[in-house]
Amino acid sequence: MLFPSKLHRSAAMSLLAISAALPLASVLWPAQSSGANQVKTTDPWSKAQVLQPADFAVELGNTKGESAPTIVYVGFRTLFEGGHVPGASYHGTASTEKGLAELKKWIATLPRATNLVIYCGCCPFDHCPNIRPAYTALHEMGFTHVRVLVLPTSFAVDWVEKGYPMQRGL
């Protein structure tokens, strides 16, 4: 007898049902990525515009003066005050109409070929309410060199806890 009891038969049927459902589950709920080359088909930027934290930390250490990127934090002011990438500036929370208007007003004074790096880090990157509106606005304004710093989990986890340089306050 293949299944000696109702309990074993029930367990085997449950395992069979689970194994049949796994392929469907992977389509409906794909696994979270590590953030490497984090580009979804709905993201407005290309893979070439994606910056990983480790790479950007090295770039920060190697560039000074005019070759250094203009770093723009597009998240919430309180988080910026608590800690941010050195040299970053804050010009409004991009998920709000007022914040996006402040960002656009400030950035309109820069040459369109400015080397820009935008980032947030308020929450998991896939759910960030700030990064996509900021990127889209800059792109629509004609900025041609915009890169996105991908912080998969948050600024605290993916930057601070890794020991990358940080600055506090405004």
Which residue stretches match the model-derived regions?
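Short loop/helix-cap segments at secondary-structure boundaries that form the rim of catalytic
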Residues: 80-86, 159
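Structural recognition of the beta-strand scaffold that forms the well-ordered cores
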Residues: 70-74, 88-92, 115-119, 146-149
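Second-shell loop/turn segments in exported
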Residues: 41-47, 92-93, 121-125
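Active-site neighborhoods of enzymes that stabilize oxyanions during catalysis
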Residues: 158-170
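Solvent-exposed loop/turn segments at secondary-structure junctions
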Residues: 76-80, 95-97, 122-126, 152-156
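Alpha-helical scaffolding within the catalytic cores
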Residues: 75, 98-107
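Catalytic cysteine-centered active loop of the rhodanese-like fold, especially the PTP/DSP P-loop
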Residues: 104-151
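Flexible, polar/low-complexity N-terminal or interdomain linker segments that lie immediately upstream
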Residues: 2-7, 11-82, 167-170
